[in-house]
From Swiss-Prot:
Cellular localization per UniProt: Cytoplasm
Subunit structure: Homotrimer. Binds to both RNA-binding sites in the C-terminal region of Rne and to RhlB.
PANTHER family: 4-HYDROXY-4-METHYL-2-OXOGLUTARATE ALDOLASE 3-RELATED, REGULATOR OF RIBONUCLEASE ACTIVITY A
Organism for this UniProt entry: Escherichia fergusonii (strain ATCC 35469 / DSM 13698 / CCUG 18766 / IAM 14443 / JCM 21226 / LMG 7866 / NBRC 102419 / NCTC 12128 / CDC 0568-73)
Pfam families: RraA-like (PF03737)
Protein name: Regulator of ribonuclease activity A
Amino acid sequence: MKYDTSELCDIYQEDVNVVEPLFSNFGGRASFGGQIITVKCFEDNGLLYDLLEQNGRGRVLVVDGGGSVRRALVDAELTRLAVQNEWEGLVIYGAVRQVDDLEELDIGIQAMAAIPVGAAGEGIGESDVRVNFGGVTFFSGDHLYADNTGIILSEDPLDIE
């Protein structure tokens, strides 16, 4: 499904929170949306592997990487796992790498920057916790919509059709 965050903001202005414009699109989908699962991890993506092995149909993984752009939390291997398990998208408050590969994969990815250095894989972090970045607080179960214009968040699903 295609999402237009500008139109959604016009229709649901009182019902959505708009994430500050810190992110760029690195994935093969220009827009994506779904119910979110939150993760908090710093320069370590081991927990992301565990979560992205789950069925992701209709879901978006929101990762609070502390805004660090020293190490990439997401690479092509991890993204292929997400695609295989039908995740709608990833929002990374941090960095990604292997961007030429990422843009070829059928998934939405919004992240702050790209860097070639990979993250540790020890599995340090927490999931299903409140995370806050970009002027918005994210809770697992909220609904996120993203496109090349921006990212918006709603407690309830928006009537898109």
